[in-house]
Every structure is written in structure tokens, then in C-alpha cells.
């Protein structure tokens, strides 16, 4: 697989910005904007990379590096792409020990997303997160 799929520029994502925005519509728009930071990855769109439990089509792969873990994500839905970008911000280049400490439910609450996301979007985000963590932490 091409190394370029692991090179999304998520440096612009600042979770504090999201927390400071007033109102769900402003947050939703910001999440969609951040989703545009993820480049399209046609080579990732294969069944073996498909995220199970996500209502919209989403794909995920992983590789372990000397410094931690790298993930590549893609999705058809704008909001799921944005949520994937948020997830990447939290997990990209983290060590296994750091990933083990990550509490996805707490992240949804911290960003005030849990009460605003529909059940299907919330489930999609959780499916992405669980599959990412499983890929990283099941490495031998």
C-alpha cells in the first residue's frame, strides 16, 4: 500500500476550537471542514479495510512505526469524514500505551458530541475508534 495514505495533514485540527464554538450548527460545520483535510484514498476502498458497524461506507488501515501507530481513514459521509479526522487527531502517532488509555466515550462527552450526534453517527464514530484501537493493540 502507498505510504502517502498515511500523510493526512491534521495539524490544523484544534479540539479546543471545537469546544469554544457556540451551538451545535457551528460545531457541525467545523467538523465537516476538518473532514475535508482527509484526502480521498481510492486504494483504501476495499472490503478488507471496511469498517464494520458503520452505517455509511468507511475504511481504515493501520501500520506500526518506530514512534507509534499510524492510521489512514476514508469515508463517504462528510460528517463521518470529519469525525474520522477528529479521531485521527487523538490517535495518530500515539504509542500502544497511550492508545490503551484512550476513552472514546469520554472524548464524545468532552467535545459535547454525544448529545448531538444521531445514534447511527455516534455508532459509526465508535465503530471507527474501536476498529482502529483493535488494529493497533492486537499487533504482536
Each predicted region: which residue ranges?
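N-terminal intrinsically disordered, cationic/polar leader segments
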Residues: 4-55, 64-67, 72, 108-140
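Glycine-rich phosphate/pyrophosphate-binding loops
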Residues: 94-109
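Primarily the active-site beta-strand->alpha-helix module of PP2C/PPM metal-dependent phosphatases
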Residues: 84
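Short beta-strand scaffold segments in enzyme catalytic cores
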Residues: 59-61
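Conserved interaction-surface patches within small, structured recognition/assembly domains
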Residues: 63-79, 88-92
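Generic structural signal for well-ordered secondary structure
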Residues: 51-53, 80-81, 100
